[in-house]
From Swiss-Prot:
Cofactor(s) this protein requires: Mg(2+)
Species per Swiss-Prot/TrEMBL record: Methanococcus maripaludis (strain C6 / ATCC BAA-1332)
GO molecular function: 6-carboxyhexanoate-CoA ligase activity; ATP binding; magnesium ion binding
UniProt cross-references to NCBIfam families, sorted A to Z: PRK01322.1 (NF002360)
Domain of life: Archaea
Alphabetical keyword list: ATP-binding, Biotin biosynthesis, Ligase, Magnesium, Nucleotide-binding
Function statement: Catalyzes the transformation of pimelate into pimeloyl-CoA with concomitant hydrolysis of ATP to AMP.
Transmembrane feature ranges: none
Lineage: Archaea, Methanobacteriati, Methanobacteriota, Methanomada group, Methanococci
Protein name stated in the entry: 6-carboxyhexanoate--CoA ligase
Amino acid sequence: MFSLKMRASRNGNHVSGAERLVNEEKIEKISSELIKRAMSHENGVPDFINLKIEKVTEKINKLKHLEIKTVHSTSKENSRNIARNLLKNELEKYYLKNGKDIEKIDELIDFAFKIIDAGNMRGAAILDLDGNRLENILERGIRVKNIDTTEELSEKILKDSSLTKRTVDAIAIATKVVNCGVISELCTSDNFSYTTGYVATNDGYFRILNLKDKGQVGGRVFFVENSKIDELYDKLENMPVIVY
């Protein structure tokens, strides 16, 4: 199989990115789709596109997708309270296990929302339980690479009219992230018009409507228990995963 990685930017600012794992005969077709995706992005036509094609020599790991659960909410305030509660329920277990003050969880989540609302990061921020940022380069964050879904899963998701290609991309990322040892993930889209975001934990992938306002930037935060950052980086960036 081959790994295809697309990155697009405009005036140095991130516009679009995507990852695929495909067989050799699909390289040309998927490459064309990725370039079209970059050129037609609602956030603007990029002035720089990078497409990297690389043969995968490692074993492909197959992971069962997180259960998809949609949470309906009509206001950003309510949606963020829902996301906060999902994150708190998961983080509390790790705070108690590590003897940390659970009253500090709200501060950690506040910091996470501040990060995603600031936007313009190519990758995700990583926060430990004390609120320390662990990315090697804070302005870039970490990108989850070498991922894809099976055609069967993609088709199954897209049969639901309420779900989109963004859901397919997100479920691949969320499933890999949780299986790499991340406690939970908070994400909003960098697409200005797409207001649905999500929280991912071992309990599932929770799509939350209206998690941000239209026209607002997006971002991604991973919550982690320990600081084995080099091991986590290696898994998130290099471990090939196909989600089914």
